[in-house]
Amino acid sequence: MAEDTQRFSDGTAYEQFMGRWTRAIGTIFLDWLAPPTDARWLDIGCGTGVFTDLIVSTCSPATVVAIDPSEPQIEIARKKAIAQRVDFRVEDSQKLPFSDNTFDIVVSALVINFISDRSQALAEMCRVCRPHGVIAGYVWDFAADRGPVCGSART
């Protein structure tokens, strides 16, 4: 029975089951967000880099740092072509290793509801986002129609 269990910390399982949703909804989310070009991005909970790839391919960022707590997922992300343009790191969203006001845009795609201390993670996102920057994300709306819910804040 244990062999049948797949975890999303396993990058291959994530890519197979969730990657297609991340691509589909991520495109809608980035259209909704309408980010400026040449921004400094932080992608929280990047997994295998599916959403990060959308950022790089559609938003013309100046820089992108993408973090995830799962080493296996980051290993897969680092093997992708976008890795040349992205700094992929294994990090904890609740203890970000970046200076205050480092990023123009901080995003989280289908992740915030899985973080154990969401308040701390959001506080960290606010800390590393520059004044007048954007913090945004989307999650599944489990209470209503199970579709995506988007939200953003400007610092």
Region locations from a protein language model:
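N-terminal, positively charged/glycine-rich alpha-helical extensions of SAM-dependent methyltransferases
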Residues: 1-11
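A short SAM/SAH-binding and catalytic strip from SAM-dependent methyltransferases
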Residues: 104-118, 141
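A generic alpha-to-beta junction signature in SAM-dependent methyltransferases
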Residues: 33-35, 59, 81, 129
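Conserved alpha-helix/loop element of class I SAM-dependent methyltransferases that forms part
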Residues: 20-39, 54
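A short acidic, Gly/Pro-enriched loop at the edge of an enzyme's catalytic core
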Residues: 94-105
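Class I SAM-dependent methyltransferase SAM/SAH-binding core
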Residues: 40-96, 120
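A short glycine-rich, Lys/Arg-flanked "PGG" loop and its adjoining helix->strand segment in the class I
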Residues: 119-134
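Conserved class I S-adenosyl-L-methionine
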Residues: 134-155
